[in-house]
A protein has these predicted regions:
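Aromatic- and Lys/Arg-enriched surface recognition patch
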Residues: 97-168
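Residues immediately within or flanking Cys/His clusters that coordinate Zn2+
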Residues: 5, 23
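Short cysteine-rich clusters marking metal-coordination/redox-active sites
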Residues: 8-11, 26-29
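Short, Lys/Arg- and Gly-enriched loop/turn segments at beta-strand edges
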Residues: 89-95
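Short Cys/His-rich zinc-binding micro-motifs
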Residues: 10-18
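Compositionally biased, charged N-terminal/linker segments
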Residues: 17, 24, 31, 36-77, ...
Length: 186
């Protein structure tokens, strides 16, 4: 638990587990830190044959709406996300931050044209989604699946073991290693 972090819902500052245990209040603004404020890390996966993310990201590199098909109750504003493409060139292609809590909402109109099967758009009416703000896009130097499989710190990631799905939890150890390897790929 010592590497757990909490994000204050009011001021947005990140608080260490030690600070959380000692006081339960944000040292920056005084807001009570509930256990739900625990910062989490995720992989959000897309299938390029179903959603043309690479085309989409060329048009808008700022924000994007994503389904939270699994873990909607665990995903929160402020959590960090690695964007993973499935398929032949599977791997991490972007890093982002969730900027909304999960909610039921129609798919943003500008995203509709990137779905190869327009019937898939209905999922946004029935399931929860979040908006992600992209912090780093690494299309030209992704962290590929084979690199993750070879790395002892990443080889047990859920997206590698059971790759069917949209959302996968990451540990802080996974997250830090992903960032480290992305920086080495520069």
């Amino acid at each position: 638990m010592g590497d757990t972090e909490f994000k204050c819902r009011k001021c947005g500052k990140v608080v260490s587990f030690e600070q959380y245990i000692s006081d339960r209040f944000c040292p920056y603004c005084g807001t009570f830190l509930s256990p739900r404020c625990q910062l989490k890390y995720w992989v959000f996966q897309f299938n390029p044959a179903i959603y043309r993310w690479f085309d989409r990201i060329e048009e808008n590199k700022e924000t994007e709406q994503w389904l939270t098909s699994q873990y909607a109750k665990d995903i929160h504003e402020g959590d960090k996300v690695a964007i993973w493409a499935s398929g032949e060139k599977a791997g991490v292609y972007a890093i982002g931050e969730i900027i909304t809590n999960p909610r039921k909402s129609l798919l943003a109109t500008e995203q509709e044209k990137y779905w190869t099967n327009k019937e898939d758009i209905y999922k946004f009416r029935e399931k929860y989604s979040v908006t992600i703000k992209y912090l780093k896009i690494i299309i030209d130097r992704p962290l590929l699946e084979y690199q993750c499989n070879k790395d002892p710190a990443l080889a047990d990631m859920a997206v590698l073991k059971q790759p069917q799905g949209t959302n996968f939890p990451l540990t802080k150890k996974h997250w830090n290693r992903i960032l480290e390897l992305i920086d080495k790929n520069k």
